[in-house]
Amino acid sequence: MQNNAQQQCTKEGKEMEQESRIAVMAIIVENRDSVDELNTLLHEYGNYIVGRMGLPYEKKNLHIVSIALDAPNETISALAGKIGNISGISVKTAYANA
């Protein structure tokens, strides 16, 4: 059974390559209890993730995660919106100009 992100990828087919954008999401995790929900979302969108880096920042008791994406703008926005709705997590997205 396909998840939502995979269904969108299948539906868009060849259009995905033409409309694809490169973006980086900066995610701040202040509530460790929300990590499972975040990881589930990232797994759902795994087809679009180019790379991921997580940094624990013990001094401030938080974690910093950066995600590099190659996906249609709508997919990137949908993922950012879902991540932003998770309690204790904030996200910002930067897009490449090209």
Q: Where is each model-derived feature located?
A:
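Long, contiguous binding/interaction regions
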Residues: Q2-A98
